């Protein structure tokens, strides 16, 4: 009788937890993100601290179940920018991926965004040799740094996060 009561008591706590649909995404899980395709990301146009809109490029799945749907919106931030300058110095751009807001059936327990970690950088083409070959080359600027907005970038989840479909 005692074993039966223990089993019934255990089931009372296990069954609601299974039905609740709680999942955990471990830190360093790779996810794929992309920028808004209409956005021009260039060292000529941006300044440090400016937020950029990103989207989840592929759904996050655990055990064959979609936890975060494709298209979930998030944020990246411009960390460093150096515009192209004379004589022939290239531009530089560094962007950090900040977070992504869950989309779909599951949400974080406190409805917070999921932290991301990862950075991408770009350097424009230099024209220094050309600038020294000709006297007028001193007036030639280097190329601006750009990031393709149609590319897919692999980043990681910044910390272990628990989600629920309650």
Predicted regions span which residues?
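Contiguous beta-sheet cores, especially beta-hairpins with glycine/small-residue-rich turns
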Residues: 21-166
């Amino acid at each position: 009788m005692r074993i039966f009561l223990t089993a019934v008591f255990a089931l009372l706590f296990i069954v609601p937890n299974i039905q609740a649909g709680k999942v955990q995404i471990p830190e360093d899980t790779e996810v794929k993100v992309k920028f808004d395709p209409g956005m021009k990301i260039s060292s000529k146009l941006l300044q440090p601290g400016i937020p950029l809109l990103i989207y989840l490029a592929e759904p996050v799945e655990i055990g064959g179940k979609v936890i975060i749907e494709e298209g979930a919106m998030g944020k990246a931030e411009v960390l460093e920018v150096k515009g192209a300058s004379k004589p022939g110095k290239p531009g530089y751009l560094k962007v950090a991926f900040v977070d992504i807001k869950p989309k779909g059936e599951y949400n974080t327990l406190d409805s917070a965004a999921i932290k991301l970690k990862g950075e991408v950088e770009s350097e424009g083409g230099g024209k220094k040799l050309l600038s020294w070959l000709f006297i007028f080359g001193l007036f030639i600027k280097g190329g601006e740094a750009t990031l393709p907005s149609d590319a897919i970038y692999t980043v990681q989840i910044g910390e272990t996060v628990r989600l629920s479909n309650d």
